[in-house]
Amino acid sequence: MADVTISQGITSIKNDPNFKKNRMAPGRVVKNVVVHAILAVLALIWLFPIFWVVLTSLRAEKGSYTYYFWPKALTFDNYVKLFTDTSSINFPRMFLNTLFIAVCSCIITTIFVLFVSYCMSRLRFRLRKPFMNLAMILGLFPGFMSMVAVYFLLKAVGLTEGGLIRLALILCYSAASGTGFYIVKGFFDTVPKSLSEAAILDGCNGMQVFTKVVLPLSKPIVVYTILTAFLAPWLDFVFVRVIVGAKSEYWTVALGLYNMLEKEYIYNWYTSWAAAAVIVSIPIALLFIFVQRNYVDGMTGAVKG
C-alpha cells in the first residue's frame, strides 16, 4: 500500500507543469558543465601568477632561477628587507612618493571630471557637441603618444628638476583628465532634472544643486571616478620612466620594481621584488573589495550616454 502511495506521489509530481517547466534539459546540463569547467580553468590561469608572486615573496632562497616551484623554506625576511635595507633601493621613499602623487592626482582628477561631466550633462551651449566629439576622439588614443611632447613642455618650464618633478607627474595625470567625462556624464543624465528644478525653486544656487542634490544621488559614479583616478598614477610606468629617469629619490613603486630586476640587483632583490609587488597590490585590492558594489553600479552609467 505504501509503495502504491509513493508511486502515485511521484507520478503526480512528474505530471505537475511546474516540475516539467523547471526541469533542466540534458543538453542544458551539459552546456552548464562545459561553461563552468571553462570558467574554472580561466580562474586558475588568472590566479596562478598571483599565487606564484606570493609564494616567491616568502621564499628564503635568493636569485630568480630555481629548478623547483615550492620554496625549500618560507620566511618574511623579504618583506622586512624592503623597509630596512635602503642603501641601494629605498622602497619606503618610493612608496611615499607614489602615495603622494596618487592622492593629489586623484583629488584633482575627481574634481575636474565631476565638474566637467555635470556641465556637459546639464548645460546647453554652443560647440557642445563638437567638444564632446573631440573629447571622444582624443580618448581613443593612448596617453603615451603625447609623452615626448609633454616631457619637453615640462622641461621648458623647469618642472623636470628637483622637487618639482612630483608636481610634473601630478600635472601629467590630472591636467587633461576633464576630457574623460563620458561615463560620469552618462550617470548624471540618469539623475532626474526635476530634482534640480525643485531645489532651485527652494532657493538653491547652481553649486548647491550640484553638491547637495546631484552628488548625494551619484555615490556610485563618484566612487568609480575616485578609483580610476587613483589607479592611473599608482600603476603608471611610462611617464615616470621618461620624466624621472635616473633620479632615484623621486622614483615611484612602478619604476622601483622595474629597477629591482636590473642585472646588478636581481640576485639579491628578486624575492624582495615579489614582496614589493604584493605590498603594492594590497591597497588596490582592499579598495576594490570595499567599494566593489558602488564601482559596478557606476560603470552602468555608461549605458545612457
Task: Label the model's feature ranges.
Residues 1-26:
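Short, Lys/Arg-rich, polar N-terminal cytosolic tail immediately upstream
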Residues 4, 9-13, 31-305:
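A structural signal for multi-pass alpha-helical bundles of membrane permease subunits
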